[in-house]
Amino acid sequence: FDTEVVVPTTPFPKMRLADIYKELEERYGYHVDDSEKNDLTTEAERLTYKLAMDKFNSEFLFVIDFPAEKRAFYHMRDENGILQGYDLIWRGVEITTGAQREHRYEEIVKNAKEKGLGEDVKFYLDFFKHGCPPHGGFAIGVDRLTMLLLGIPSVKEAQFLFRGPNRLKP
């Protein structure tokens, strides 16, 4: 692939989601309706690379303080309903999402109900009746990471078998 892998320096900078949208508008004239600001739009995700480079001289940016409505019911929230999680953006592409997980039975049941979930997740919720320690988790986009690391132009070319909205089997 004739690419040089550069080991990044740490710590990676972090910004609140609301602050990112504010800076994208002020610096680059990027504006979206308030209804879209509960997550990063695809274009906002791309622009975070420029923002991270301009502001922090970093290819990486942790995005924090997402509102709960767009995330999984098992992500822990603070007293204001803000998730205790993050997205990690590298070169304008989300490569991982992580969060502290909810471990308190009453809270996770309430969160599941808010999302309209019921019997289909009962088996999962039952684990928490017996006590669960505080914990966290993350999911990494290995195909996206491979694409960026090797300079491959499309994630379709970085996967063994591409699956997408219109193609689920080989």
Regions found by a protein language model. Give the residues of each.
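Active-site pocket scaffolds in enzymes
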Residues: 99-100, 104-170
